[in-house]
Amino acid sequence: MAAPSPVRVKLLFDYPPPAIPESCMFWLLLDAKRCRVVTDLASIIRHKYMDGQGGGISLYVEDCLLPPGESILVIRDNDSIRVKWDGAAIERNQEAETCNDGAQNKSKKRHWKKSEDECDSGHKRKKQKSSSTQVDLKSGKDGGIRDKRKPSPPMECNASDPEELRESGRKTHKGKRTKKKSEAPIENPPDKHSRKCPPQASNKALKLSWKRQTSSSDSSDTSSCSDQPTPTTQQKPQSSAKRQNQAATRESVTHSVSPKAVNGISSTKNKKADAPISSSDMDTAVGGNETLICPVPPEDLSTHIQQHSQSPTSDSAESIELVIKKSNASLSSLTDNRVAGVSDKLSPNVSGRGRGRGEDFSWRGQRGRWFRGQGNNSNRGRGRGDSSNVFYKYNTEKEKQQQLEESATNVSIIIQNPQETMKRDYSSLPLLAAAPQVGKLIAFKLLEVSENYTPEVSEYKEGKILSFDPVTKQIEMEIISQQTMRKPGKFDVVYQSEDGEDIVEYAVPQESKVMLNWNTLIEPRLLMEKESQVQC
């Protein structure tokens, strides 16, 4: 049978393939040796024309489907095969979707730009409106200020409205009362202020009273303007009279207070400049009933008294004497307290109180705290607990006497090491190839479990053969050599008896009689009778 030759096939695509998009019809030279089934041809077409993309491929010849498992011999030379690829439709759908998405994004961008433009135009309109309103407000304010500066036209009162007349009468009464209250402190004689107040305080009080008078007069003027037309020129003589009264009070204050007293007052004022002065205090100082007394040092007060003793006024001298007595009493109390504090600091053995409250009662501990490094623990109170440390003092003389009286005895203790047992040399003994007779002594080694539960070869042990089974090679042996007692390990169980003794149950028992296999013995050697007797 001749070998299959290559076949020329025409391929017809519904859409141009992605690898060669120039056409939909192609010639393909099919090698029948490489293909056995129709599926192989489909894979070749996918690799060449679809760039290995997914999607189902169906092949038709004369509108008849070629089954994927059919032999490749179905296809003849110059057959036209229609290729139907499902991936082309999927690609076209994806392209359409991307186009739609791009159009939507463009429309969104356009809408966004439009909204931004609208917002900008809205902001511009708002700014224009706000600027116009600001201009209107400024113009309104300017007009209001000009209107306030202009004298208000007189209001015409109608006699037919009795309620308006009553209100205007009430306002006039209120204005008169405020005038009387403001003028009351000025009517007081200037001597009282000059005797007991410093010039700065009086100046401040006068300024406050002047402000209140002006404010009250303004309010009264505005209220009266609503009732009757009053010209503004009438306030000038009143203000000039008030200024003359103020100047007179200032001159009287400056004449009455000496320069030395003023210097003393200024020094004390610098020390106590932080003390706030309220408006109510200033009103009471100016009122006349309450007076301000300024502390002055005694030297300045003596000069002040000498100067004022020459003046003919007796009232001023009496008031100055009272002030001096009070200031001297306060100064004496201050000096007594300072001297007492200094004496307390200088005297360390004073049994006085500390900073505690109350007096020293017999049933209470002394309160307060003493200075650091001074005083005893008795000066501390019992409120927080006495933190006194107790130290025991030992009499060294008694200890020395006891050491001298004691009898010294020399005792010598000899410490001897235990005699070392000479280890036996088992290497010179003859090795055993088979089990010896019953009753013989042998030396052997065993594979045992150590304290760490690891297998180790033990040292030579001596044992006496009690019985031997030649079939099973089991030896019953009595171990003669002394066995070293090992400590119980983690797998050993320790019991406690009624007497309190510990009973150890070893995982690997240590018994004198043992059943062993002859093959388990390592290097068994025969012990001579002489050596066994010497050992006994």
From Swiss-Prot:
Disulfide cysteine pairs (residue numbers): none
Gene Ontology MF annotations: U1 snRNA binding; U2 snRNA binding
Repeat positions for Sequence: 353-358, 380-385
Biological process terms in GO annotation: spliceosomal snRNP assembly
Residue ranges with Polar residues bias: 239-257, 303-316
Tissues expressing the protein: Expressed in both oocytes and somatic cells.
Sequence ranges assigned to domain Tudor in this UniProt record: 425-523
2 X 6 AA repeats of R-G-R-G-R-G as annotated region, ranges: 353-385
Location(s), subcellular: Nucleus
Keyword presence, Transferase: no
GO cellular component, one term: sphere organelle
Superkingdom: Eukaryota
Segments for region (Disordered): 96-316, 368-387
Segments of skewed composition (Low complexity): 213-238, 371-380
InterPro entries: Coilin, Coilin_N, Tudor_Coilin
Bias (Basic residues): 171-180
Keyword terms of this UniProt record: Nucleus, Repeat
Record's compositionally biased regions (Basic and acidic residues): 181-192
Family label: Belongs to the coilin family.
Record note on domains: The atypical Tudor domain at the C-terminus contains two large unstructured loops, and doesn't bind methylated residues.
Protein name listed in UniProt: Coilin
Organism: Xenopus laevis
